[in-house]
Amino acid sequence: MHPLALHCIRDCTKRLTRCLCHEGGGPHPILASFQTNFMRDRLTPYALTFRLPIIVWQALFFIGPLLFMIAMSFFLVKNYRMTEAFEMKNWARMLSRDYVWSSYRYTLLMAGSAAALTSLIAFPAALHLAFRTSEAARRWAIFLLIIPFFTSYLVRTFSWYVILAESGVVNAGLGTIGLGPYTMLNTPFGTLVGYIMLTLPLVLILQTVTLANIDRSLVQAARNLGCGPWRVIFAVILPSAKTGLIVAALFAFILAFGDFVAPYYLGGSKPPTLPILIIDTTKSGQQWPRAAVVAVMMMVTLFVIAFTAIVLAYRRRASR
């Protein structure tokens, strides 16, 4: 890099660090870490040598396809063939359709509900593993939580298809006490079950690791001051683990938002989620550009939500 450009970057970083500082006069910890580590090491040839494979991989298999997908959203399909162009017709058509926005709202609602429910279901178990079990037992529990990933997600989804069917295990159990049968497949409930099945092991692992790293002296001090169990959870544990809990919920939302299998096989695709809408659009006259519009909408939505969640989590953590 040109020496003048390097000098400008360092000067801007110093000015920004002086502007964003704590009340005591020290630099903001995030910016201080950025200045001391990133700016000092990244520009050296030694550091670039190790980071080059990651940069090349991301450029070839993420940034490149992403840019092509964005460009493809402006292409046109004529006689079932995609032609290069720069037209806003696909965007105007898709953004003006009510079914697109209905699918968008439904996908947001289902992914958000799945993230919230998964976090609530996982938290008591994670709390028990972090504070009530030994370290050896916790390791075995985490290993057992990894085992579901050894099997195909599609196979696990079909197993829930059998469980939730009208003649399945759940309705058979309810029938023994005079209840049912209930329709659970091809409903939003089936979609939620699939989302929770997909995200629960990962969220539980992340929450357990986060809670296990909380300083036990803080919890003990709160108990010595007379705080009850619920007071300890809300006043000490949740604020201390806020960043990890937000990241776990964020992963659940991202996985559910982009999932195709659960809403298609368990939810019946009525109404369709955005991934199902993408598949249906490509099957309808080879409209890949219109499907690219929906994909870009999903990418922008996930970027905004992920960026907002990360900023809020780390900003609050740094401000304590």
Annotate the PLM regions:
Residues E87-L95:
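A short amphipathic helical element positioned immediately N-terminal to and/or at the very start
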Residues Y46-N79, M94, D98-A212, V236, ...:
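Membrane-water interface segments at the C-terminal ends of transmembrane alpha-helices
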